[in-house]
Structure formats: structure tokens, C-alpha cells
Amino acid sequence: MKEEVKGIPVRVALRCRPLVPKEISEGCQMCLSFVPGEPQVVVGTDKSFTYDFVFDPSTEQEEVFNTAVAPLIKGVFKGYNATVLAYGQTGSGKTYSMGGAYTAEQENEPTVGVIPRVIQLLFKEIDKKSDFEFTLKVSYLEIYNEEILDLLCPSREKAQINIREDPKEGIKIVGLTEKTVLVALDTVSCLEQGNNSRTVASTAMNSQSSRSHAIFTISLEQRKKSDKNSSFRSKLHLVDLAGSERQKKTKAEGDRLKEGININRGLLCLGNVISALGDDKKGGFVPYRDSKLTRLLQDSLGGNSHTLMIACVSPADSNLEETLNTLRYADRARKIKNKPIVNIDPQTAELNHLKQQVQQLQVLLLQAHGGTLPGSITVEPSENLQSLMEKNQSLVEENEKLSRGLSEAAGQTAQMLERIILTEQANEKMNAKLEELRQHAACKLDLQKLVETLEDQELKENVEIICNLQQLITQLSDETVACMAAAIDTAVEQEAQVETSPETSRSSDAFTTQHALRQAQMSKELVELNKALALKEALARKMTQNDSQLQPIQYQYQDNIKELELEVINLQKEKEELVLELQTAKKDANQAKLSERRRKRLQELEGQIADLKKKLNEQSKLLKLKESTERTVSKLNQEIRMMKNQRVQLMRQMKEDAEKFRQWKQKKDKEVIQLKERDRKRQYELLKLERNFQKQSNVLRRKTEEAAAANKRLKDALQKQREVADKRKETQSRGMEGTAARVKNWLGNEIEVMVSTEEAKRHLNDLLEDRKILAQDVAQLKEKKESGENPPPKLRRRTFSLTEVRGQVSESEDSITKQIESLETEMEFRSAQIADLQQKLLDAESEDRPKQRWENIATILEAKCALKYLIGELVSSKIQVSKLESSLKQSKTSCADMQKMLFEERNHFAEIETELQAELVRMEQQHQEKVLYLLSQLQQSQMAEKQLEESVSEKEQQLLSTLKCQDEELEKMREVCEQNQQLLRENEIIKQKLTLLQVASRQKHLPKDTLLSPDSSFEYVPPKPKPSRVKEKFLEQSMDIEDLKYCSEHSVNEHEDGDGDDDEGDDEEWKPTKLVKVSRKNIQGCSCKGWCGNKQCGCRKQKSDCGVDCCCDPTKCRNRQQGKDSLGTVERTQDSEGSFKLEDPTEVTPGLSFFNPVCATPNSKILKEMCDVEQVLSKKTPPAPSPFDLPELKHVATEYQENKAPGKKKKRALASNTSFFSGCSPIEEEAH
């Protein structure tokens, strides 16, 4: 009852969940550590919190329930209300701990939460209490967006639920569905129905996040079957709160954001209630009505309930701030004091109250009339009452005397009993020592005999030392007995002193009487205990004596038993022999007399065996009796020890009671003395006041005379007061400057600390995001390593050997391992930085800092100075913000202008790029025509092979003319290369301008790899725009077979031997030159693209045949001499084989790369055929004399090759870049 009046604190259990896979993938670390064997948790390195229960991540659900929740259920059956409350941030495991997502399929799983286990335990206890009748009702509600919804009602729209407050029953919910349940299965089905109706949604932090507060209530009413009027009512509230959340982490939008705002609002009101109840200094208003959640939990927090708060936290360091807030709220909740009472039925309580009132009135009536008077007495009531009062007074006085005597007798009895006990203990010790000394004396005699026999000097010395020690022991035992006797005498003297103290007043008589009765009762118990102890000890003594006397008999019986057993064995053997002899004698008729004797002997032996067995059984019974006696003796000794301990405790209790009574008596005596002294002082003060009154009456006359003088002095004092006030104002104005400086410095420091704290939080969030990205990269690399995939290298299309592929795979695995190690090292470094920052924030943000912050402002003057300084800082910050905003607007406008310019330049770049692409297409077409021309010349050389056989001189002239044509073509190709180089320089200039524009706009509108990569397929930068474009023609050059073969083989080798790393070098090495543009008038021959059949052909217009300098196709041209003869044949072959078709450069064929250009470079097969033809021609050339000297011809050819060698590099580059979009490398294909 005393605890209920004082209040019972709210019990807090801390539960920490393990790290979830998402936190592990983000690289989060544990920020909580647990003290083994203690309910204590440490945040960081030195900030610790202590609670009633602490459960680490490895704790199972069953242990949490049995340790923290199960004790509350016992109080529910005693009539007390109980509440289990789960509190914490979102995703911390509240619904898991409470079992808010329970279904019937999880019945026997170890992950079942608190609510299903509570239901099972309730019905188990109900089954045990067979003498009570129980009625159970359940209700289930949720608070969603500050609206109460009934989860057990099938149609939520119809239910209108309101909260009402009853002065007798407390908070009531009107309109809430309550279902009566009889078995546990019905209750579980109600729970499952409510869980299915509960509002749940997914957020970025939790896939199954509770969006409402849920309260499952079980109402229990119990009545005794024997007494229907006595009944108890209790309620058990099981609360699963929604978790506090941050929009930054949950990324909630729309309805989820609105739900999160309402959840945080309700939890804020709950936190305010916890803070108000947990602060002992405030003791003021508690804001229960701020939200519906706190209104419903009014009895659970600071009211009529046993409450347990399960604080659920996350151990991840990314949630440190939310975890710390939860720990602080839980620590405050431990300071809340509840006042639970037994909830009795109002009718039963009223009935019991009336019964007590009737009893009190009956007692008062008896006291007034002196008991029930018979009707025959005719004496007046007043005289009878007077005599009864006198008699009562005399009886009271006699009772007081008897109580004093009883207390004195009890004290003396206690003292005597204490002496007896001490003497008994001393006697027992002495007997034990006597026994030891006897044993020592026997040992001493043995040792002396041994010494005499062995004559060893060392043993004699040891024996002397033992004798000295025995004497010392006896002396010490005598001293201890003397000390005990002295202690007993001092105790007796103290009691005598106490008894000789002055008598107390009548007000202490009741306490004295109670003390005397207690002492008498304990003395009586002690006497009875001593009697029982004496009987037990006597019985034990007798039984031990009997045992000692029975011991030799026991030995004798054991010997007799052995002898009897031997005799029985011998007689048994003899009996068996006789039986055998009788069986043999039956066969022989002559031995009848002998068998008769043997039969009699057999009967005698059987009688002896029976007698011996009887004796054996009797002696074994005696031995068993001896063993039972020993057991009884040991049991008696144990009971004697227990009774002695009980006697000691009773004596100690009597002594403590006597000591308390003595202290109380001394205190009362001291109070009486103080009261007497106070009365004397009051009398003296009364006399003193009388004298003072006389003096004051004499002084009064004098004061009236001095009134005028006092009036004058008052005016002077007022004048002085005004002067002092003026001086005070001046000092205050002077002191205000010092106060302002002090307040300014203090506020500056506080603002700086708060700003640095916020910056540290921002850096902490950045570090957490960095670690999250690093963890994702590590996870991706590990997945690639486990699956055997390689990172996609940028390689050209080529054929790899098996060893190269294996080498690349091993190199890629090593690189992945190194990347993983470097990333893990970086993650460890980030984790160390995060832990350091979090520890600094914990040190900076102490719980008392907000309270201590305003303690420095104690006066209105300091508050004014602080307000003035803050207003000044606010104005200056506003001005600075406006300046920054104006500069930001200017930078935005300049950025917009830059973007506009960049957009225009990009459009211009696109136009120039399209023009260059068209120009390149034209150049490619011309190049293809030249290749076809060379192939036609090769065909012509094959046709002329027969003519070479006829005349060597004609063949030599034709070869020289071919060489000349090839030289001219080579010169033209060089001019084309120079033009290409010029275009590339212009490209580089425009590219630099574009880069400058991007830097000026501070935005990378084009990706860096698209603009600057040497491997890009779109590396064309347009030249400066010109006002007018003039169509130009490029010079044509011829190229001999050897040059084409060399260039083609070199390009093929480069494609086969080069990889992705050598692309940049190749692209940088080749720098095409700008083609030289010549006017139309310098071009010789026609520029037809068709058959040269009409007068649009320049050569036909001038009435001349097309020649080598013409751009027309020799196989199609009708204006050539050789083409006129075989026109029909050429036309047929042109349409089928030799015609040139310009392919669409944007057409993509499956399996080929994007922008696969027309293959203009001859492949190795064609070049090989060319070489074979040339070798045949050279072999078939006869060594006949001719107008041209062949050695000279060879000399000219070698000189030509030597002159041509410096230009091979450019030719090779030109041959490798003759594809579509010449001047840029082809698109690289990823290795799959």
C-alpha cells in the first residue's frame, strides 16, 4: 500500500534489432555497445544509459516476453490495469516485437510477438483459477491521421468514435466495438482481423511501415463463485505506435507525407507528456489533450496502470540521431510515477463502504451508551455513565501498571534467555574443545612414545611448540568467555539506565503497551522454543547413547549373520545331498531303513534351516532399525540447528525492538524537556512584553511631539531618493555597455557553436552517402567477381588467342580484387570519420545544453542586449542574403546567355558537320571511282597480256605510261591529304572555341568523352562559317599497285595487332591534311558520272575522246575508243558486276557495327591477285633489246621507291582511314 501511495515508476525495456541487409549493403557500422550482465547500453564511446531491461540483437522473442512482459499479467489478475507500449523510430522493430503482423500460420514460430503470447498466457492462467468466473472482452482501434478507426467493425464509415472522460472509470471510448471471447482462438482471430484492416504502406526505409498507432485492449472481469458480490475489473492495453520518420530518409510524397506529418505530431505530443511527467521540478500542467494518442494513454502515463515501455532502436550509425532521441525519451519515461489501484466493481465498493460505516456507527453508539443496557434497570443514564467512566479510568490505570510490569518482566526474561543462550554456546564450544584436547592428548602420548623410540630432537621441538599452542588456545578461550560476560553486564546496565529514565506522558502509553505485549509474545515464543529445543536435544542425546550401546551389538549381529548364512549354506548342501541319496535309494530296495533315516535327517535339516532363516530375518530387522535410528538422529540434529537459528533470530528481533523502544523513549523524553523549556521561555516573554508596553506608552507621547520633525525629515529623504534614482540610472547606462559586450560575446559563441554543429551534421550526412555509394560499388564488383563477368573493356573488334583471353581474364580478376580492397579501405576510413563526427556531436549536443543556454540571461537588461544583438545580426544576414540573391540572379542571367550562345554554336556546329559529312561522302565516291579505275586498268593489263607477247617494246611503253599515271595520281593524293590536314586544323580551332564556351557557362552540356575522346565516331568540328560556299573539286591522283598493296597490308596489320589501348596512339599519329581546291578551269578532261553519251560531256562537246584525265568510268564511257567496240558487253557487265553503288551510311546491318562504310581499300586477296599479275608480266617480259634499257628502268624504279619511302606513313594512314567519315576512328565494340 505504501508503494501505491508513493507511486510505481514506469518500467523501460530497451530492445536493439540487428543490422538489416540494406544497412549492411550501405556499409553501416554498429554505434551501440552492451555491457555484459548489466542493463546498460553505451552510445559511441562514453555516453551510457541504464534501463530496467536491455536486450541485445541476439535476444529471442520468448526471452523478451518472459523477462519483461509476463510479470504484468499476474497484476492483471489482482485487479490492476497494465499497459505495454512499443516506442521508437520507423523500421526499428516495434510491430515485430508486439506481433502487430501476426497470422494464424505463425502460431508455433519463435518469432511470435508480445500480443499472441499475452493471449496464450491469459487463458492458461484462467484455466488454473477454477474458483473464479471470468469475462473477457477485446477491442482493437487505430489512430490514423488523428482519427480513431475501429479495426473490428466491418464498415468503418458507420462507426463514430468519441473519447469521453468518466470521473469513476476514467477515459472511455464511446462507439468502439467490444467482442466477448471465450477461448484463445477467438481472441487470435480478432487480432488477425484487426491486423488485416490496419493501414500499412511502403517507404524508402521500411517496406511494411505502419502508418497509424494501434491499441489492442483486453478487458478482464473476475468474480468468485462463492461470493458473487466480490468482483474485480482490469484492462490490458497493448500499444503498437507508428515510428517517427524523416521525409529526407523515407522520401515520402503525397498521402505518405501527410501520414508522416500526423505521426510525428502525435509522437511530439507524447514526448511533451513524457517530459512534463518526468520533470520533478515542473510539477505543473501535463498536455494530455494535445492529441488523441496522449488522451487515450492518460491512465498509462502517470495514472492508474502498471506500464512497460519497450524502446526499440536501430544500431546503425546512420540512424544515430534518432536512436539517441529514443534513448533520451526512454530515460525520461523511467522518471514517471504511476499510482495503480485495485479496480473493484463500483456496486461492491459502495456496499463495503456502507458496511464499514454501519460498524463505525455501532461502535460510537456503544461508546455513548456504555454497551447494550437491559430494560429492567431503572437507574438514570447519567449516573450509570458516570460510574462506568470511573470504572473505565481505574481499569486503564491498572492496565498501564500491568503493562509496565509486563514490559519489565519481558525485558528481564529476554536478558536471562540471552544469558542462557550465551552460556549454552560457550558450553558447546568448551565441550568441543575438550574433545579436541582429548584427541590432542592421545596424539601427544603417541608422539612422546615415538620420540622416545626414535630419539629425534626435531620431533621433540615440534611437540613443545604444539603444547605451547594448546596453552595459548586455552588462554584465548578464557579471555573470550570473560569478554562475553563483560558485554552481558554492560547490556544489563544499559537496560537498567533505560528503566530508570523519567516517566513518559499518557500519550506514549499506547506505544508502551504495544511494545510490552510484543515483548511478552516474543518471550512466550522463546520459552516455548527453548522447551521444544530441550526436548529435541534430550531425545537426540538418548538416541545417540542408544546408538553407542547398540554399536557392539551391531558388530556381534553382523558376525552372527555371517555365521548363520554359512550354516544355512552348509545345511542346504547337506539337504541336496540327502535328496540325491533318497532318489538313488528308491531304486534300491535293500536300503529302505537307510533311506528312512535319511528322510528324517532331511526333515530335521529343513527345520534347522527355517529356524536359522527366522533368526537371520530378526537380526536384519534389528540392523534396519539401527539405520532408521541413525537417520532419525541426523534429522533431529538438523531440526535442532534450525530451532537454534530461529531462537537466535527471535532474540535478535527482541533486541532490535527493545533498542527501537529505547530510542523512541529517549526522543519522547527530550521532547517533553523541550516543551517545558519552551513554556518557561513563553512566560518570560510575556513578562517582557508587559514591560515593553509600559515603555511604549511613555514613548508614544514623545513621538507625537516629534511628528513635525519627522515630516520634515521625510521630505529630505524623498529628495535624496530622487537624487539616488538619478545616479542609479547613470550607473545603469554606464553598466549597460559592459553587459552588452558580455552578452554579445556569449551569443556570438553560442551561434558559432550551433552553426559548426549543423555543418558537422551536413558533413556527416555527406559521409554516410559516400559510404553508401562505396558499399554499392563493392557489392557490384563482388557480384561480377562471383559470376565470372569481366568489366566491359573498350576493345577493337579482333580475334584473340586462348592464352590472351586467359591472361586478360586473370588480369581483370586481379584488378577487380584490387578495386574491392581499395574501396573497402576507403569505406573503413569513412566509417572512422563518421564515428569521430558522431562522437563530437554527442559531446556537443548534451541533454542539458538547451536548458543551460539561457541561464546566462537573468535580467531584463541582459535580455534587451541579447535581443538587440540578435536583431542586428538578423538584419545583416538578411542584407547579405539579398546581395547573394542578386548576384545569383546575375549569374543565372549570364549563364542563360552562355547557354543561348552555346546552343547557337551547337546548331552552327551541326550545320557544318552535315556539310562536312556530305563533302566526305563526295570524296569517298571519288575515291571509289579511282579504285574502280585502277581495277579497270588491271583488267586492261590482263587483256593486253597477249599483245605483250607479240611486242616487248609496246609493253615497255605501256608500263612506263602506267607508271607515269600512277605518279600523277600519287601527287593528286598528296594534295588531297594536305587539304584533309587543313580541315583538321580548322576542326581543332572550332573545338577549342567550343570548349571555352563550355567553361564559361560552367556546365558540361556535352559529355567529355563525346567531345574530346580520340575514339569517338563524331569528332567533327565545323570550320568557320563563310558568307558564300563555292563548289570545289579535288584533284585526283593515281596510285600504283605496290602502294595500294602496301597501304592495305599495313592497315590490316594495324587492325589485327592493335587493341583498345593503342587506338589513341594511332589516331594521334595520323593527321590528315586539307585537300587543295582548284578551279574548274584547271581540271583537264570531263567530270561525267554516267555514260558520256550526250553533249553534256565536255570531251564529246569538244569532239574529242575521253582519256586518262577524265573522271568518267572507263567501263561505262561510250566516248572512249576501246569502250565503243564492246558497248553491249560492257553495259551488261556493268549492271551486274562492275557498277558502283553508293551505300546508305546510316544503314545498320545486324551483326555489324554502326556506320559500316563502303569498303574502298582492296583486301589482301585482290592485292595478291594484283601481285601475281605483275609477277606474270615481269616473267613474260623477254630480255630482248629495246629502245629502253632495262637496267636503267630498274634504276628508275628503285629511285622512285626510295623517293616514295618518306610518304609511306601518310599513305598507310590514308589507306587505314578510307572508310566512311574519314578522319575519325571507327566505333569500338565491347567485348562480350
UniProtKB/Swiss-Prot annotation:
Changing residue 317 to H: In TMDI; uncertain significance. Transmembrane segments: none annotated. Residues 496-515, 1122-1142 are annotated as: Disordered. Highly expressed in hematopoietic tissues, fetal liver, spleen, thymus and adult thymus and bone marrow. Lower levels are found in heart, testis, kidney, colon and lung. Residues 1086-1144 are annotated as: CRD. Residues 1132-1142 have a biased composition (Basic and acidic residues). Binds 1 [4Fe-4S] cluster. In the presence of oxygen, the [4Fe-4S] cluster may be converted to [2Fe-2S]. PROSITE patterns: KINESIN_MOTOR_1, KINESIN_MOTOR_2. Interacts with the cytosolic iron-sulfur protein assembly (CIA) complex components CIAO2B and MMS19; the interactions facilitate the transfer of Fe-S clusters to KIF4A to ensure proper localization of KIF4A to mitotic machinery components. Interacts (via C-terminus) with unphosphorylated PRC1 (via N-terminus); the interaction is required for the progression of mitosis. This is Chromosome-associated kinesin KIF4A. It comes from Homo sapiens.
